[in-house]
Curated annotation (Swiss-Prot):
Positions of the record's site feature: Essential for channel activity, possibly by being protonated during channel activation, and by forming the channel gate and the selective filter: 37
Pfam family for this entry, one: Flu_M2
Membrane-crossing residue ranges in chain numbering: 23-43
Annotated organism of origin: Influenza A virus (strain A/Turkey/Ontario/6118/1968 H8N4)
GO biological process: protein complex oligomerization; symbiont genome entry into host cell via pore formation in plasma membrane; symbiont-mediated suppression of host autophagy
Name of the gene this protein is made from: M
Annotated region described as Disordered, given as residue ranges: 60-83
Regulation: The M2 protein from most influenza A strains is inhibited by amantadine and rimantadine, resulting in viral uncoating incapacity. Emergence of amantadine-resistant variants is usually rapid.
Protein name per its UniProtKB record: Matrix protein 2
Intravirion topological segments: 44-97
Lipid-modified residues, S-palmitoyl cysteine kind: 50
Free-text note on domains in this protein's UniProt record: Cytoplasmic tail plays an important role in virion assembly and morphogenesis.
Record site feature (Seems to be involved in pH gating), residues: 41
Known partners and oligomeric status: Homotetramer; composed of two disulfide-linked dimers held together by non-covalent interactions. May interact with matrix protein 1.
Similarity comment text for this entry: Belongs to the influenza viruses matrix protein M2 family.
Length: 97
């Protein structure tokens, strides 16, 4: 017999559920874990775009520019942009046989 067995019995007022050993610590722990899992799953589905975008892009920020003069910030931006700007002649086509 399982610890999580539920028995439904008809009564005068309708159907009621009598759980065997509902005060067992294992049943209580399983119920708490189940409820927490459900809450976390619902939050994940509601906020998955925010959460995963934060994890994907939030940790890839550039170095802090606090205390750096504006001229050096602009020079850094230009270096970063020139590293990104590559014309099509620099790409190599690789053909697999």
């Amino acid at each position: 017999m399982s610890l999580l067995t539920e028995v439904e019995t008809p009564t005068r007022n309708g159907w009621e559920c009598k759980c065997s050993d509902s005060s067992d610590p294992l049943v209580v722990a399983a119920s708490i874990i189940g409820i927490l899992h459900l809450i976390l799953w619902i939050l994940d589905r509601l906020f998955f775009k925010c959460i995963y975008r934060r994890l994907k892009y939030g940790l890839k920020r550039g170095p802090s520019t606090e205390g750096v003069p504006e001229s050096m910030r602009e020079e850094y931006r230009q270096e970063q942009q020139s590293a990104v700007d590559v014309d099509d002649g620099h790409f190599v086509n690789i053909e697999l046989e």
